[in-house]
Regions:
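Juxtamembrane/disordered regions of integral membrane proteins
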Residues: 2-118, 122-144
Length: 144
């Protein structure tokens, strides 16, 4: 499926919305106590929103460039898309967590495992959901 610039921007917006909502639920509800327990001494009282927004914009662009775009262009199935999304999440979150473990004193090992698993799951789930939503929207509107 060939998509134009408007469709690419629409799919980016869908990716951003899906990823942000899932991550907000994870960080704000499900894992809030876990991170407070293990990283409480390092956590800010207020989120550094410019840094957070920069992360989301860059990471979502990565999902778009390396997974969702090729999936739409190549006609990948949902499972194939989720697999590649999971791999991207695994490698990206490994990069952060293993670097933190190597360089930051007392970086908690449980955080490494949970965070890498989370990166794998959220990126796989986001990629799969975005493919379903994007294809549905593109078909319904003919092109976005």
């Amino acid at each position: 499926m060939k998509i134009g610039v408007a469709s690419t921007l629409t799919v980016y917006a869908i990716t951003a919305g899906v990823f942000f909502l899932i991550d907000l639920f994870w960080l704000g509800v499900l894992a809030k106590g876990f991170y407070a327990k293990h990283l409480g001494h390092l956590l800010r009282e207020q989120v550094n929103w410019p840094a957070a927004v920069a992360f989301y914009l860059v990471y979502i662009a990565g999902i778009q460039v390396f997974v969702v775009g090729p999936a739409l262009q190549g006609g990948w199935g949902v499972g194939h898309t989720a697999l590649w999304g999971g791999l991207l999440g695994f490698f990206a979150y490994c990069t952060f967590d293993l670097t933190a473990l190597a360089l930051i004193k007392s970086w908690p090992l449980p955080v490494v495992f949970v965070d890498i698993a989370w990166g794998t799951v959220i990126t796989a789930a986001t990629a799969a959901a975005v493919i379903i939503l994007s294809r549905t929207l593109i078909k319904a509107l003919g092109a976005v």
